[in-house]
Amino acid sequence: MKEYRTVAQIAGPLVFVEKTEPVGYSELVNIVTADGTVKRGQVLDTSDEIVVVQVFETTAGIGRDSGIRFTGETIKMPVGKDMLGRILSGGGKPIDGGPDIVPEKRLEITGAAINPYARSSPEDFIQTGISTIDGTNTLVRGQKLPIFSASGLPHNDVALQIARQAKVPGSTEEFAVVFAAMGITREEANYFMADFEKTGALERSVVFLNLADDPAVERTITPRLALTTAEYLAFDLGYHVLVILTDMTNYCEALRQIGAAREEVPGRRGYPGYMYTDLASIYERAGIIKGVKGSVTQIPILTMPGDDITHPIPDLTGYITEGQIVVNRELHRKGIYPPINVLPSLSRLMNLGIGEGHTREDHKKVSDQLYAAYAEGNDLRGLVAIVGKDALSERDRMFLEFADLFEDRFVRQGLYEDRSIEETLDLGWELLSTLPEEQLVRIDRELIQKYHPKYRKKAQG
């Protein structure tokens, strides 16, 4: 391997090297500093005169006299079944004090979106144990369903609760979680590690932690390392894998930082123009392949800057993914956990994974009726602020009280409370029973007579 000393310029995490030999895009580079330290980097861009190398560590110590070695290889993730139960850095190195991973394979981290023709339609219900997701915005195996949050909201707690509780009810197939955190503080990293170890969720998980003071370049490869691991577990070993990526906003900020260092022409709000394509290369790696046992389901979590759902990051994410779960500041102020607002939330694949043979025959109708009643009660709150509660009719007061009851009993649940889908639907019926039967216009009469608490008590009596 030849060594060159042709460093022309250093800008942030980028090293500009005068061209010396043909190099490939994404090729790995070893940079040897004057004191013999070897730093790793990757070819980001190349032209006739200059090669741009992004360094995975700090560029401190790199100078014109540093040696540059082009390896001729791209980044590969060493994978093996013994990765389960391990905590790795954002660059894929063990940080839990355990031994190095003995790889069964080394896989390219770029991966590829699943061929649309080879995709199988998602249809298996995943139970998260959270009523606002399971009951009204159901997650289906093979889906990509993001959580839209904002700074200061408990999205990390929601992510950990899903990682602990997610399962396919009644299934004996192996289930695993790949959890990748990007740009988090050391305090958050310690919190994540302690929770995974304390609750026993680590046994079936692989955890990647990229810290806020780690290089931005590493942040751009962390989700790809996580997805490569998930694809190996799913499509080689037959696991059903849930991938949780948090926080995608930090990932996009890293893209913007690197784009600025490369002096690229910025797009919306300074983010690179190719951010849509870049995000799609991550999100589209979820799915089920026909004839293959495993599956990859994704829950990317992002914080909306300024609580703005029209910001480029949630906006582009919404185009690519199949719905969204919206974490709400107003519910959080009321002390409700998880503060998930079901009204702007949506799961586009929900209807494929619910109903008879999946969850329960009344699931769709109960969900629709809960939505309708809560939406009406929520609208009436605005009216009360203007005319006062006394001006409302008796019917309106019922729906107003229903909205409060829905938030207090259906939305609110404990951090370690794992509700089955039956418990969630029964709770929905309990709340709907506070309304007159003639107001349950979205539920068929035979379902009311079968599941309404009034008729159930008669049947049991």
Swiss-Prot record:
This is A-type ATP synthase subunit B. One of its GO terms (biological process) is proton motive force-driven plasma membrane ATP synthesis. One of its GO terms (cellular component) is proton-transporting two-sector ATPase complex, catalytic domain. GO terms for molecular function: ATP binding; proton-transporting ATP synthase activity, rotational mechanism. It is found in: Cell membrane. Keywords: ATP synthesis, Cell membrane, Hydrogen ion transport, Ion transport, Membrane, Transport. The keyword Cell membrane applies. InterPro entries: ATP-synt_VA_C, ATPase_a/bsu_AS, ATPase_A1-cplx_bsu, ATPase_F1/V1/A1_a/bsu_N, ATPase_F1/V1/A1_a/bsu_nucl-bd, P-loop_NTPase, V-ATPase_su_B/beta. It comes from the Archaea. The gene is atpB. CDD domains: ATP-synt_V_A-type_beta_C, ATP-synt_V_A-type_beta_N, V_A-ATPase_B. HAMAP family: ATP_synth_B_arch. Component of the A-type ATP synthase that produces ATP from ADP in the presence of a proton gradient across the membrane. The B chain is a regulatory subunit. Belongs to the ATPase alpha/beta chains family. SUPFAM superfamilies: C-terminal domain of alpha and beta subunits of F1 ATP synthase, P-loop containing nucleoside triphosphate hydrolases. It is a peripheral membrane protein. Has multiple subunits with at least A(3), B(3), C, D, E, F, H, I and proteolipid K(x).
